[in-house]
Amino acid sequence: MQLISIFLFICFLFLLRKWKKYSKNSQTKKLPPGPWKLPFIGSMHHLAGGRPHRVLRDLAKKYGPLMHLQLGEVSAVVVTSPDMAKEVLKTHDIAFASRPKLLAMDIICYDRCDIAFSPYGEYWKQMRKICVTEVLSAKSVRSFSSIRCDEVVRLIDSIQSSSSSGELVNFKERVIWFTSSMTCRSAFGQLPKEQDMFIKLIREVIRLAEGFDVADIFPSYKFLHVFGRAKRKLLNVHRKVDAIVEDVINEHKKNFATRKNDDHALGGENLIDVLLKLMNDKSLQFPINNDNIKAIIIDMFAAGTETSSTTTVWAMVEMLKNPRVLAKAQAEVREAFRNKVTFDENDVEDLKYLKLVIKETMRLHAPIPLLVPRECRKETEINGYTIPVKTKVMVNVWALGRDPKYWDDVECFKPERFEQCSIDFIGNNFEYLPFGGGRRICPGTSFGLANDYLPLAQLLCHFDWKLPTGMEPKDLDLTELAGMSAASKDDLYLIATPYQP
């Protein structure tokens, strides 16, 4: 007991010294305003008991659109207005182009040798170029069209089977199953035996990657990391994910030798095929190895399965709450697919209202409410305030989408609001940034949207959807899961009645 007391006292003195050093430094720089801070933990107590993007929006109403927080030993700035977002993502984009270290990504992504979380530099530039030009190019996304159509047919068949037996359909579970199968086949060329386990593990990573673990707020105090639960869980998840993906890569390597002289276009191959070819590219500044491939695959699954399924589920929730929108969207898709025995993605191109539904869903339910955080590379002045080097910068895109200065009836689900405006997904409009903006904008935007449009269109075309008997739209639970994404917390059970023209 005495040894424990001595250890805790030493920890207290060590932290007190660091706190005094921080206080002295903060007094010499004009930091943005922020809520009051406590010794050691800084502003962390303000985030207790709520989802961070909601708590931070409320704090910003008092302290302003550029707000400073002290998250343990990490200095952080939260952006909550389009003007400030433009400063970070465009005007000073290069100064904020890097990523802070996060425990989850260090462990899961092989010391951040992926694309989404790697620090800004030549390696990131190389890997992003590969991603944009070969892995997730428009040509590659189109090449996956037959896989999407095939998986949509399987999705429709599974729901028809359940509805014919009188079962309630777990809409959320079915959509996750679709997006995971679609992503597996795009990445691996097939459905791995451990698909369900793999997706479960990836979703656990997303839950653990919020960035507020002890290791993330006290990164230099290694002795404190033993008190965090996340590290043990992440190491266990990493071990299992690594084994699954390693097996898939080795299987592809065996088959790759027999196909190395096959001159297929890159867009027609799966992700691992593309990366294995590049592994032999001697012109690359940074040679690709197994860890690079595994890290990029994890990126694709974390983004491809979670964000797409989250958006599709929230779109259905909002349409059930707004029957007028549901009826209008169904009328459009049923007219587009009328008298067609088969379908393809060309039919989706003309579904203008459905696209507005997805766009409005992302306004209210940004897939990643606090964009993947950036890190300041160079001391920068914004709006008269100093942003020091190594500051963690969070852009609250969830709050941007609900800013009453830019949006009318912010809490209302109105797809029509986008009919006569030029707002797009590519980061040009700073009040609407579901995929981010600037150099670190999500490179998989086209892939993600394709995985939203087609399945939602077919689900609306083939079924009439109702809430279970006795349940009203007002009873729908809008609670979000903890973690980096904003997925709905509860399953969504619905009655699916096959549509008879």
Curated annotation (Swiss-Prot):
Transmembrane segments: none
Record bears the keyword Oxidoreductase: yes
EC number(s) recorded for this UniProt protein: 1.14.-.-
Requisite cofactors: heme
A molecular function (GO) term: monooxygenase activity
Entry-linked Gene3D superfamilies: Cytochrome P450
Listed InterPro entries: CYP450_71D, Cyt_P450, Cyt_P450_CS, Cyt_P450_E_grp-I, Cyt_P450_sf
Record key words, sorted: Heme, Iron, Metal-binding, Monooxygenase, Oxidoreductase
Residues that hold heme according to the record: 442
Keyword flag Zinc: no
Entry similarity comment: Belongs to the cytochrome P450 family.
Protein name per its UniProtKB record: Cytochrome P450 71D6
Lineage of the organism: Eukaryota, Viridiplantae, Streptophyta, Embryophyta, Tracheophyta
